[in-house]
């Protein structure tokens, strides 16, 4: 199997073929996902909550991300692997470059950073130094204390601001964008306005791809279950079948449905 590259996702967008991605944090699950056909994975700072048991992503460190990136890379050597730069790991462009080097050496193909137009210089510096960047707009969990909780973003006038941010990130060199917890109508506008692939989570079925935290996809999330989550394991019966069902429902547009979407 050839390594998956960003060009595959560009082709999917051009051909209007939806694609499924998922978070992964260790060797065994990464191998399972790869074996069942998921070729894009994210080592997310969500590990702070799902793996480490914190109530937010803020305690996660760059070394935490690098550790899990190494494990996932061993399990899925040919996947396109995105890794988050965690809270305060990219406060300046120079700091972003230093920390991106750590996770890239650990096996990442691309780094994901949260924020809008204020990141333009950072995105430029990273891409000029051969570090591919995935942006992240909407509900950005590292900003939970600014937002006052995990709330829907991009309603009303904020929608145009988010679209402007997305265009600015693309112009700066970002090659992917994650949209989290935004109205379907806004997600559609952003996806159509950008030439780069847009991956949604809580953004309806109008984006180019979808991502889920693996614990949500398997129904093993403790505490609050997000509206956009679906327990594929409950219907499928085993983990491999659940992964295949998740992929099939994303690719056909069945998931996410109206019950998983915001307006």
Curated annotation (Swiss-Prot):
State the family named in the UniProt similarity comment for this chain: Belongs to the PanB family.
Functionally, this protein is described as follows:
Catalyzes the reversible reaction in which hydroxymethyl group from 5,10-methylenetetrahydrofolate is transferred onto alpha-ketoisovalerate to form ketopantoate.
The alphabetized UniProt keywords are: Cytoplasm, Magnesium, Metal-binding, Pantothenate biosynthesis, Transferase
Enumerate the InterPro entries for this protein. Pantoate_hydroxy_MeTrfase, Pyrv/PenolPyrv_kinase-like_dom, Pyrv_kinase-like_dom_sf
Keyword set includes Transferase:
yes
Q: Where in the cell is it found?
A: Cytoplasm
State where 3-methyl-2-oxobutanoate binds: 45-46, 84, 112
- What is the free-text note on the cofactor? Binds 1 Mg(2+) ion per subunit.
Organism this protein belongs to: Salmonella agona (strain SL483)
The pathway entry for this protein reads as: Cofactor biosynthesis; (R)-pantothenate biosynthesis; (R)-pantoate from 3-methyl-2-oxobutanoate: step 1/2
> Residues that bind Mg(2+), according to the entry?
45, 84, 114
Q: Active site annotated at which positions?
A: 180 (proton acceptor)
Any one cellular component term from GO for this entry?
cytoplasm
What name appears for this protein in its UniProt entry? 3-methyl-2-oxobutanoate hydroxymethyltransferase
- GO molecular function terms noted in the UniProt entry: 3-methyl-2-oxobutanoate hydroxymethyltransferase activity; magnesium ion binding
The catalytic activity, as recorded, is:
3-methyl-2-oxobutanoate + (6R)-5,10-methylene-5,6,7,8-tetrahydrofolate + H2O = 2-dehydropantoate + (6S)-5,6,7,8-tetrahydrofolate
Q: Which biological process, per GO, is one annotated for this protein?
A: pantothenate biosynthetic process
**Which EC number applies?**
2.1.2.11
Which cofactor names does the annotation list?
Mg(2+)
- Binding partners and assembly: Homodecamer; pentamer of dimers.
- Grouped into one coarse class, the protein's main location is cytoplasm
Q: In its keyword annotation, does this UniProt entry include Cell inner membrane? A: no
Query: NCBIfam families under this entry?
Result: panB, PRK00311.1
